[in-house]
Each structure stands twice: as structure tokens, then as C-alpha cells.
Amino acid sequence: MISTAIQQLVNYGLDTGLILPDDEIYIRNQLLMTMQLDSFTEPEGDVCYADLESILKTLVDDAVARGVCDDSPTARDLFDTRLMGVLTPRPSIVRANFEERYETDGPQAATDWFYKFSQDTDYIRRYRIKRDVKWVTKTPYGDLDITINLSKPEKDPKAIAAAKLAPQSAYPKCQLCVENEGYAGRLNHPARENHRIIPLTINDSAWNFQYSPYVYYNEHCIVFNSQHTPMKIERATFRKLLDFVSLFPHYFVGSNADLPIVGGSILSHDHFQGGHYEFAMAKAPIEKKWVFPGFEDVDAGIVHWPMSCIRLTCADDERLVELADQILTAWRGYTDESCFVYAETDGEPHNTITPIARMRDGKFQLDLVLRNNLTTPEHPLGVYHPHAKLHHIKKENIGLIEVMGLAVLPSRLKQELFDLADLLVARAPTAGYPEALQKHAEWAQDILDRHPELNADNVHLILQDEVGHVFAEVLADAGVYKMDTAGRAGFVRFLESVK
């Protein structure tokens, strides 16, 4: 009976604290309105429920059956988000709760509460996050995190076709804009009725804090400008990053680079990503200490990491801003033909930085990863980008998350690796692989040559390990200065140029 499912959702709201007992009748009636129902039958006895996913499925199935909701993945997501929006407190209440916890119990208590809240509202769909495939691969650079992302919805063909016919809207301007809070969504823009953001002030400017709905790592948060303004790495960027870790010292925060190929997927809206997690790069040691003239108070050095990373540590955050700005300015204009580093070609700039900030033992720390987006006929997608032989695993941009040591791999790989495992165990000739697996054929033969012990019991672990090592190669390709004698000598030449 649909009344039971409605009461289950009301009880879920009460159990999670999203609503209070005084809200019960009001919320029930709002849910009835959303479902386009005008009556309710009180269920007999206690109303129990298994989980939120099953409650929402029951309600959406009923709405679909009555023609209230279209039967497509996109339409279903829009509708169940509308239901959860009924349970979600208004922004003013959420912000007051966050601020009270921050002032009374500290920043970690505030973020702990907000992270749970963002899951309870189903903005972060816990039941989908669980589907992601994750493992760790040991490499010479440390333990790399590998994930095949299954929680981010695939593009729905029906929705894509319908979106092309729908009137085009420029509101909100993008998925990061503040105007998303409470937005009902449409076929080509996700619903955000259950989405709440926390305003922040960093570098005396208006920014905001929210969580990523896809949670690639623990407490994966997004910090974004209140204005729809493009990504830009500049002196103010370092100030903003350090201001954020001052507010939330248990979090790291970083920015994607501001140029195509080496930047993230959204260059149009200035934003950072952070969270409560320590990546392999953060754990990587300094392989060569360095002293920048005039900054003897700053501990600096080259990090033992396949991407070219300079680490700066100091108790005085303003000193880090000053030195980071000098390094950025030097790198923007730096050319070293012997290392195939060109600041610009035909007026197009190539050099930028991916910066990451954190607190370490009571001091401020900045990691500055040197990036270059030069392309050539041999490497049309980027010289410092995964090369073609690795595209069967990772072809997409190497953004902030990958830079730090977490591979976010496409969902297609789950089935491809499963199918490939069967072929490897059978020692099937690679020439006969189906079309979808042909891109893996050369890699598969190499795996067989190196793993004569491969069998049905160990094939999946071997494949996971091999994918992890491919990701290590991806990072090496994306590194400007290679981890060899010539590369490290080139890195030192750049450090010497910073004045």
C-alpha cells in the first residue's frame, strides 16, 4: 500500500533528524502532493522499513504506474530527489546547525555532521557509492588508490534525446553555481532539491562549501566561488587554499590547473576540491631538499612522486603564499628545450600548476605540481598526458584527484576486466578477442608472458594489480620532469631559476 511507503519515508526523516515530530503531518501532506495523491490511509501497527533505496523505489514505481513520472533513469532520479527535497530542511536551518557545531564543538564536529546530513538527504546516494569498485596497488611511489566509478549515472540515451528537443536554459549556469541549491533539475541538469551549501569567506571573498555527490574518497568536498567565474591559478589561489585549511585543519584542499588537458572537467567555474583523506602523494617523502634564496625559513624540496611536485612547509602561511607566487611566476614563463618544456607556442601558454594545501604537524604545507599542456602530432592529446598505449585504461584528463594518486576509471572497465579475465584464464589467442576487448589485447599478452602462474583463482587480483601499475605509468607520462637523471637535472635547473 502506497500510504505505508509514504509513512516509511516520514519515519526515515524522523529517525535521521531531518524532520521533527511536529513536522510529521505537514511532511506527509507535502509528500502526498508530490505524489499527486489526495488521500492517506493510516497504516496499522508499527511501520518499519529496510532502507531508503527500497522506500524510494516503491514510491517512484507507483508514480510511474500512474503516469506521474516518466519511466527513465533520469526522470526517476529527478522525481525521487523531489521527494527527498520535502524532507530536507531549509538552507537557513542547515547553516545555523553547522555554525553552532563549528563554534561549540569545532570544525571536525561541524563537517562530521554536515557529511552525515548530506548522506541522509540522499544528496550523496550511499547505496550507489557502494557499487564503486575500489582497490589499492603497491608501487615504487607508494600505495595508489584505484576506483572504477559506478555511482555517477551513465548518460541515459532517452534523456539525451529528449534534452536535445527541450528548451535550452542557462539557469543555473553550471552544476557548481549557488543557484543549484533547491533547484528542481531537468533532463540535462540534475535535481538539487535536497542539496545544501555552507557559505565561507576565504581571502575576503564569498565562497561556498559542499560535498561531492559521487564521493571519490572520504568526505570529498567541493569549495566554490559564489560568482560564476573561470578557473585561474594565481597568487590569490594560494591564499584561498591556505585560508580554507585554517578553517578546516583536518581537511586538505587543492585546485585543478587552469588550462585545458591538464585541468579538470569544469574550467568555467572557479572551484577547489578537498576532503578528509591522505593520498599517496601526501605520504610521499622529499627526495631532494631545496633552499630558495630569501626563504630559508621555508622547508622545501622535490617530492618522490612521478608528477613533478615541489613541497613547501612553513608555520607562516603568508611566506608560503609569497614563495608559491614566485614559483608560479617563474614556471609560467619558463622554457627548457632540452626537457621539451615550452612556456608558450604561437602565443598559447602551456605552463601552469596544480596546487594542494594541508596542515602538517601544526604547520602550513603547499604541494605545487608543475603542469604543461603542450601537444604534438605524436601526442595530440598532450605530451604530458597519458600516452596512446595507456588509453585502453585511462584516456581522460589527469586532474587534481589523479595527480594526488587516485585513479578514477570509467565504468566500462568493470565488465571489460571481467570478460578479459575469462580470456586470460583460457589462454585465448588475443587476435580473436571481441571488438570491445581488442584495445586490451597487447596488454593482455604482456600479462600472460609475465604471469605464467595466472589461473582462475588469482586472475582478478593480477588484473587489478596490473591496472594499478598502468595508472603509475599514466602518472609518469603526465609528469613534466621524468624520474631519471636527465629529468631530475632539468627539475633542478628550474628550481635554480626561481628568483
What are these model-predicted stretches?
Residues M1-V223, Q227-P230, P306, L320-A324, ...:
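Active-site microenvironments that recognize anionic phosphate/pyrophosphate groups
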Residues N194-I198, S226-V253:
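Helical scaffold of the NTase/Pol beta-like nucleotidyltransferase catalytic core
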Residues A236, V245-S268, G274-T335:
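Catalytic or ion-translocation cores adjacent to nucleophile or general acid/base/metal-coordination motifs
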